[in-house]
């Protein structure tokens, strides 16, 4: 554990609710939400910021769970004392999405009627349902209005949904490396990943036991991880270099890297959750053009939209579509395209300019 600039040891907490009506008409009952908080809620409860995670993320956004942890939470560079999301000033909340596998209700949860994991019997959940569950948590914490909702990638979709589903419940919205709907190409990559899982001999219609479809999930992660990088970064890091390990397994260093990414992913993620969450991403759509403008017209908060020059998964053009529609709806929006060679994952990586942009946007709003 490296405590330099960190908020230290953090405990994941759990909130349980009786039920959650879902968009498709079914009801999830009970509902458990795993979450973490950083900083102190002000007496007037007006300094709360909700951080929404991406596909493979979780509630552990900052700090460490134990002194033996080698790495902090996934956005530790941005959350903490004096950082972009300053815990000396703000009360930060991050929760695991429902349908995920990091403590919130999902396919790994025990079905109350069978006493066994839901597996593929878990109901389909949407981005709207994820946000609805977050709203339950925010109300449980006694907060009526959030100072800001922020997220990148899938987290950006959740932030957008917050702005239109609960317009009176947030003052600011930060959307990074995201989109208002998936393109055919983005859906295609997710479909290949899902088919890899479905083709695994251990799939068993999603009702697998400890013999889970690890090979299929590893392949899905390999495909997905390619989209998080950039051509320049891959050329710089790997080129056409040979692997260090078994040359019968792969001929190039980039192949060895992707195999490692896939194999390490299966130890921390669930195949069913991968299917559920990617489907939620693919089905989310606020439309284009006038339809998108109309969808965003109910929002009342300020927006910061950030894109990245080398992001080919959610290219800058998709962020500019959001900005154009927000402007057409006469909303207050700030837009920045950051030059970065890191691809889609740029929003996760430490970047002094990004740190200052986020901090400046929050500080230039009405003080909490």
Curated annotation (Swiss-Prot):
One Gene Ontology cellular component: cytoplasm
InterPro entries attached to this UniProt entry: AB_hydrolase_1, AB_hydrolase_fold, HAT_MetX-like
Disulphide-bridged cysteine pairs: none
Positions annotated to bind substrate: 221, 345
The keyword Cytoplasm is assigned to this record: yes
The EC number(s) this enzyme carries: 2.3.1.31
Lipoprotein among keywords: no
Top-level class of the enzyme under EC nomenclature: transferase
Any Pfam family the entry gives: Abhydrolase_1
GO BP of this protein: homoserine metabolic process; methionine biosynthetic process
Catalytic activity: L-homoserine + acetyl-CoA = O-acetyl-L-homoserine + CoA
Compartment(s): Cytoplasm
GO molecular function: homoserine O-acetyltransferase activity
Domain AB hydrolase-1: residue ranges: 47-349
Assembly information from the UniProt record: Homodimer.
Family the UniProt entry places it in: Belongs to the AB hydrolase superfamily. MetX family.
Name of the protein described by the UniProt record: Homoserine O-acetyltransferase
Pathway membership, UniProt: Amino-acid biosynthesis; L-methionine biosynthesis via de novo pathway; O-acetyl-L-homoserine from L-homoserine: step 1/1
Active site: 153, 311, 344
UniProt function note: Transfers an acetyl group from acetyl-CoA to L-homoserine, forming acetyl-L-homoserine.
Record HAMAP family: MetX_acyltransf (MF_00296)
Key words of the record: Acyltransferase, Amino-acid biosynthesis, Cytoplasm, Methionine biosynthesis, Transferase
